[in-house]
Swiss-Prot record:
GO terms for cellular component: nucleoplasm; nucleus; RNA polymerase I complex; RNA polymerase III complex. Present with 8680 molecules/cell in log phase SD medium. This is DNA-directed RNA polymerases I and III subunit RPAC2. DNA-dependent RNA polymerases catalyze the transcription of DNA into RNA using the four ribonucleoside triphosphates as substrates. Common core component of RNA polymerases I and III which synthesize ribosomal RNA precursors and small RNAs, such as 5S rRNA and tRNAs, respectively. InterPro entries: RBP11-like (IPR036603), RBP11-like_dimer (IPR009025), RNA_pol_Rpb11_13-16kDa_CS (IPR008193), RNAP_AC19 (IPR033898), Rpo11-like (IPR022905). Residues 1-11 have a biased composition (Basic and acidic residues). Keywords: DNA-directed RNA polymerase, Isopeptide bond, Nucleus, Phosphoprotein, Ribosome biogenesis, Transcription, Ubl conjugation. It comes from Saccharomyces cerevisiae (strain ATCC 204508 / S288c). It holds the Pfam family RNA_pol_L_2.
Length: 142
């Protein structure tokens, strides 16, 4: 009987391992220097135009962005509102348990809401690039 207990003990012993997320981080090769620009292919399913909330002339539209939250929503709203062709921009999270971001853009007659969204995304990316380069510059000078 003691032999059975000993076998059960050895069968259930687990060797200590690092948590899975730490193992995955070690396997990833991340370049933080910014020396190498990598172009990612755009995800066509990431942003959806909500056709029910879009005007015929395209000056007002609502979009749904998948897998995003307040972090992108507030920054994007701020950058889009800096555009003088934009009359209104607001965002909402429909429900806390859903990872969706709804954004509404209304423009003056010269610009479409799609153009304003594209310009806002580009301007936000440019802003992030400047912040990253300044940060990297300061880190290297330390």
């Amino acid at each position: 009987m003691t032999e059975d207990i000993e076998q059960k003990k050895t069968a259930t012993e687990v060797t200590p391992q690092e948590p899975k997320h730490i193992q995955e981080e070690e396997e990833q090769d991340v370049d933080m220097t910014g020396d190498e620009e990598q172009e990612e292919e755009p995800d066509r399913e990431k942003i959806k135009l909500l056709t029910q909330a879009t005007s015929e002339d395209g000056t007002s539209a609502s979009f749904q962005i998948v897998e995003e939250d307040h972090t992108l929503g507030n920054a994007l709203r701020y950058v889009i509102m800096k555009n003088p062709d934009v009359e209104f921009c607001g965002y909402s999270i429909p429900h806390p348990s859903e990872n969706l971001l709804n954004i509404r853009i209304q423009t003056y007659g010269e610009t479409t809401a799609v153009d304003a969204l594209q310009k806002g995304l580009k301007d936000l990316m440019d802003l992030c690039d400047v912040v990253e380069s300044k940060f990297t510059e300061k880190i290297k000078s330390m």
